[in-house]
Amino acid sequence: MREVLLSECIDLLYESHFVISKPFGRSCFDLIAKKADLRFLIKILKNIDSLSTEQSEELLNIAKMLQAVPIIIGTRTRNSVMEEGAVYERYGIKAITFNTFRDQLSGEPPVVYANRGGFFVNIDGAVLRETREKLKISVGELAEISRVSRKTIYKYEQNEANPSAEVAIKIEEYLDVPLIKGINIVDYMEGLKSQKSREEAFEKILKEGEDFKIRVIDILGDMGFNLLETTKAPFDAVAEESKIEDSENQNIIFTNIQETENEEIRRKAMIVDEISKMLNSHSLLVLEKKTNENKRITSMSISELEKIGDTVDLLEFIEKRKKSKEI
C-alpha cells in the first residue's frame, strides 16, 4: 500500500510540474519536490501515527534549514481511516490524504482540521461580528441557534476559538454569509524547530560511537557553518553558511561523512548530489582517506578539510571540483 501511494504521489508531482528527487528508503522523508520557490519534504505513511518523535524532529529541522514545507501523506490514523478534505497534525507536521494533497495542488485547499473532540474549521471572526451587528442579531440569539454559549460566540468573533464544522455551517446558514476559511498547507510552517546546536549533535553521535563524524562536524563548525546532524536522512549533516541571510543565495552543503568508501557509500553520495543540484546547493563526501576519484561525486579527505580556512574557502574548493568534473 505504501509503495502504491508513493508511486501515485510521484506521478501527481510530475503532472503538477514539480522537480522530484529519487525516493529514499529508511529516511525521515521519502521525496523532495520543488516548483519555483515552493519546496516539499514529503513522508509517505500508511498509518500517520507510525511516525516516530525522532523522525519528526529531523524532518522539521531539515525543512527549516531548506525553507521547505514538511508534509505527511497517509491513509489512516491508529484508530480510523483518514477523512478526505481534512488536515491532521502529528508533531507539528500537517498530515493529509493523497486526494486532499491533489486538491491542494489544484488550488482547492482543505477547510477542515482534525483535533481532539472532532473536526473544526477556521472562520473569519471579524466578518462574523460585522454581519451579526449589521443584521442586529444578538450574541444570545446566535448562541441559541448554534447551540453554544454566548462566551463561545465572543471567542469566535475574537478569533480565540474555532467552531466545529457543524456549528460553522449553522452560523453561515443563519447569517447567510461565508465565514469558513481554507487551510493552505503550503504556507511556510510557523514554529519550526531550529537546527540542533553542535553540542546536541555531538551528544547524539557520541552515543553512537562515531568519533570520525564528530571530528568532521567540529571542523565544519569551526569554519563558521550552521550545522544540522542527521541520522534519518540520506546525508549525515547539512552545513549552512552563517553569513548568508538572503534565501536566494543560500549556501548549503549536504555532507556525507564516512571513514571508508564503498559502493553503497558512493551510491548514497550520488543521490545526495542529485538533491543538491535540484536545490541549487552543494554536496560533499568527507572520507578518512580518499581512494579513487569519482567524477560524479565531490569528495575530500579529512586532512584536506583540515587545511581549509573558512566557509568561503570550502565553497570555493567545492565549486572548483565541480568545474573540473564538467571538463
Swiss-Prot record:
Keyword flag Amino-acid biosynthesis = no
**Signal peptide coordinates:** none
**One MF annotation (Gene Ontology) recorded for this entry:** DNA binding
- InterPro entries cross-referenced by the UniProt entry: Arc_TR_HTH, Cro/C1-type_HTH, Lambda_DNA-bd_dom_sf
Q: Which UniProt keywords apply?
A: DNA-binding, Transcription, Transcription regulation
Q: Which residues bind DNA?
A: 139-158
Ranges for domain HTH cro/C1-type come to 128-183
A Pfam family recorded for this sequence: HTH_3
Which protein are we looking at?
Answer: Putative HTH-type transcriptional regulatory protein MmarC6_0210
Which species does the entry assign this protein to? Methanococcus maripaludis (strain C6 / ATCC BAA-1332)
